[in-house]
Amino acid sequence: MCGCASGEDAMETRRPLHPLLLFFSPWLLLLLLLVVQGVRSLQFTRDDFPDGFTFGAGTAAFQYEGAAAEDGRTPSIWDTYAHSWRNPGGETGDVACDGYHKYKEDVMLMNETGLEAYRFTISWSRLIPSGRGAVNPKGLQFYNSMINELVKAGIQIHAVLYHIDLPQSLQDEYGGWVSPKVVDDFAAYADVCFREFGDRVAHWTTSIEPNVMAQSGYDDGYLPPNRCSYPFGRSNCTLGNSTVEPYLFIHHTLLAHASAVRLYREKHQAAQKGVVGMNIYSMWFYPLTESTEDIAATERVKDFMYGWILHPLVFGDYPETMKKAAGSRLPLFSDYESELVTNAFDFIGLNHYTSNYVSDNSNAVKAPLQDVTDDISSLFWASKNSTPTREFLPGTSLDPRGLELALEYLQEKYGNLLFYIQENGSGSNATLDDVGRIDCLTQYIAATLRSIRNGANVKGYCVWSFMDQYEMFGDYKAHFGIVAVDFGSEELTRQPRRSARWYSDFLKNNAVIKVDDGSVSTAFHAQL
């Protein structure tokens, strides 16, 4: 999660040049103008983004909807986790923002803010309580009604099919994502969503951050479904195998995703004219030193962070780095599966917050028993002076240059992919006068524009999140919303923060944003 240094609003009008410049020769004046505009600052408005680019904000079903046991919804693996002793904060998503009952007023608030797009997730266990089979009419009614409200408001809809909320019934029946049985069940669930909502939803994302959930849910067991094995798990897992299950989870996620994409293309795309993509978590990584070992470790980390998902989707197989590291523990694609996953996407969604430094830890591969962390054989540093860890650090440092470098890397490595920035924001400021969040969003929106001007094919940007909601890390104490929610009030009162008014001014009034080009990235590297 990114934290941002405080400062004044980045909105301001264009200032006139100093009169003394008029005394310089035309050539020198031109040079000075280039320095001012190209190096020291960047000024832009909403209109500087390409046609078809959309700005929005997001929420997620478990974190927003509440009504956990209402109108036929059954528990998901996230419900089970939230109600267990493994949940360090003890809070649950039983009520959350009560979006299940308050979505109409929330859509009105989105419209007032000027959102052009809204990214939300669908609860599988609300729509199909048993995980397969009969559709819950109440769940269907809820999503149809919310989608209709968004359509009436003229807000582009970006729907996500899965976000850490597998129906618990499927987890109990066959182990969920570690079983190949989940592939057909997910495709059938996706088909219901495409059929019922696809006449109004044109942007579909199958899964959020599987590259992170593999390690957190199936290696160290920290997140749902809390599977791990000794000696790797952080928690006292009773089920799991940290050496192989992260790889099985990703393998079946890719096959489920690709099956849903093929189904959409064969049954729905011609009539609905929508697109389907997958989301990945996308930190950027710098080598800790210029040593050959640290540089190689950084490239290895990128293969695990990005290539684990993108290499199969683009080339039909896992990166050679992963094959060498994991050996027989990494599943093989059959010829049919390789053909199925290759090019099985129309876009890639990126969740981007911060950057890490990386150093080599090749001694990890000498362990008699290895997990994914050992296979990566690297250490992660939030700063050059921090204590390193074996797993990447979400961090609190702002590094918009990292987003630019990530997009540049992905374009060079995997071709001219179409991207949506589906999450970016800050959870560090609970006040209504959240100037720090404005600074954060300003810098990352500017980085997005710079990337586009440098050739990246980015079509949208979503703030995380539209309103405060239940968070996996921090429960209700993390405040990512540009709209504040008073979780202590019975009405769960919403109140736009200063960042919401700033975002609205940018989107509705084409307000000018001025950014000191690179200044925040410079500060990031200075503190490291």
From Swiss-Prot:
Its EC number is 3.2.1.21. Gene3D superfamilies: Glycosidases. The active site is at 209 (proton donor), 423 (nucleophile). It catalyses: Hydrolysis of terminal, non-reducing beta-D-glucosyl residues with release of beta-D-glucose. It comes from the Eukaryota. A beta-D-glucoside binds at residues 63, 163, 353, 423, 464, 480. Glycans are attached at residues 236, 241, 424, 429. The keyword Transmembrane helix does not apply. Belongs to the glycosyl hydrolase 1 family. This is Beta-glucosidase 19. It comes from Oryza sativa subsp. japonica. The lineage of its organism: Eukaryota, Viridiplantae, Streptophyta, Embryophyta, Tracheophyta. The gene is BGLU19.
